[in-house]
From Swiss-Prot:
Stated name of the protein: Tubulin-specific chaperone B
Residue intervals of the CAP-Gly domain: 182-225
Matches recorded under Pfam families: CAP_GLY, Ubiquitin_2
Species the sequence originates in: Saccharomyces cerevisiae (strain ATCC 204508 / S288c)
Keyword list, A-Z: Chaperone, Cytoplasm, Cytoskeleton, Microtubule
Taxonomy, superkingdom: Eukaryota
Amino acid sequence: MVRVVIESELVRTEKELPNSLKLRQFKDRLYHVTGVEPEDMEIVVKRQYDNKEIYSTKKGGAYSNEDEDANFLKGEEELIVVVTDSNAQSISNQLATQAEGIPSMEVISEEDYLRRDQSVLRWKMAHGYGRFNAAQQSQRAALAKQDEAYAREQLTAAIGRHCRVTVDGSAPREAILRYVGPLPLDVMGTWCGVEFPEAAGKNDGRINGVTLFGPVAPGHGSFVRPRAVEILSKDEESAEVEDVHDDVESDDEI
């Protein structure tokens, strides 16, 4: 375990975190303390004893691979983690602007933070925002159920076939379906491993040191949700279609 002081606009608290966390898990822990959405986080990690910066992310950036270990947690007994919300319109930034009489450097417990009227997580829980939105969570559960059925009934038998991959409205990319199944990560449900003819992906077919297909050339593989995969007909497979890739970050592609 590593002792961490977590600072944001609305809270400064201490926690002990496992030093075996992945980057994705680390961001999720920070979300539950600060209320800042993972995609909006700017993170700076410093050693507590000399204030030296050992890790940081930039505004609008993303981890090169969120499934890698958070190596900065290893070998360090005490750290300071500063979380800044890069989204000026976010709830946490609005509450920080409105908050009065809250000493910014006061160390409080997570329980005291949650009890505060200005707590971002309190606001989200009260208003059903983000992960506390029951309707949204129900919709996600329904999508996951549809994914499972689609993968089981159509995609498993189509491994090796050409497909079209469309993630979050980005331009379609042609690929070959290489894998259907779970991932060795803390993500739920079935995923599809695809191989692109060009470096339009996220990895080489390996996740967390486990080879799920390939390995292929670096950047030629990705794992996407089943709903992002459309198996091409025989006629479409033989036709030449230009492969266009927009560099769009999405939780539905790893």
